[in-house]
């Protein structure tokens, strides 16, 4: 065999090994990213469940006047709160 043919064969083998190594690293990093994303989503789901359970066990107190003072509550009314906090003095 000629030297040129041997150089081409060994070059092709080397290029294939390098390509295989790079491709394997890419696949491995994608798989690790997918596992990390799944773990993160599971943690987010657990946090949301814990928040919902805590909200169920600790309801927001409603003032005796019926005015909701918690601004994160869906029933919060800014006008009613301001009228309650700063009553008009005639």
Swiss-Prot record:
GO terms for biological process: proton motive force-driven ATP synthesis. Keywords: Acetylation, ATP synthesis, CF(0), Hydrogen ion transport, Ion transport, Membrane, Mitochondrion, Mitochondrion inner membrane, Transmembrane, Transmembrane helix, Transport. The modification N-acetylserine is found at residue 2. It is found in: Mitochondrion inner membrane. One of its GO terms (cellular component) is proton-transporting ATP synthase complex. Its main location: mitochondrion. GO terms for molecular function: proton transmembrane transporter activity. InterPro entries: ATP_synth_F0_esu_mt. Pfam families: ATP-synt_E. The keyword Acetylation applies. The chain crosses the membrane at residues 7-23. It is a single-pass membrane protein. Mitochondrial membrane ATP synthase (F(1)F(0) ATP synthase or Complex V) produces ATP from ADP in the presence of a proton gradient across the membrane which is generated by electron transport complexes of the respiratory chain. F-type ATP synthases consist of two structural domains, F(1) - containing the extramembraneous catalytic core, and F(0) - containing the membrane proton channel, linked together by a central stalk and a peripheral stalk. F-type ATP synthases have 2 components, the catalytic core F(1) and the membrane-embedded component F(0), linked together by a central stalk and a peripheral stalk. The central stalk, also called rotor shaft, is often seen as part of F(1). The peripheral stalk is seen as part of F(0). F(0) contains the membrane channel next to the rotor. F-type ATP synthases form dimers but each monomer functions independently in ATP generation. Belongs to the ATPase e subunit family. This is ATP synthase subunit e, mitochondrial. It comes from Yarrowia lipolytica (strain CLIB 122 / E 150) (Yeast). The gene is TIM11.
């Amino acid at each position: 065999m000629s030297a040129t043919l041997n150089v081409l064969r060994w070059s092709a083998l080397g290029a294939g090994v390098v390509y295989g190594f790079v491709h394997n690293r890419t696949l491995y990093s994608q798989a690790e990213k997918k596992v990390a994303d799944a773990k993160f989503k599971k943690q987010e789901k657990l946090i949301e469940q814990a928040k919902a359970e805590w909200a169920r066990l600790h309801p927001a107190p409603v003032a005796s006047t019926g005015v909701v003072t918690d601004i994160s509550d869906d029933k919060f009314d800014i006008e009613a709160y301001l009228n309650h906090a700063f009553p008009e003095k005639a």
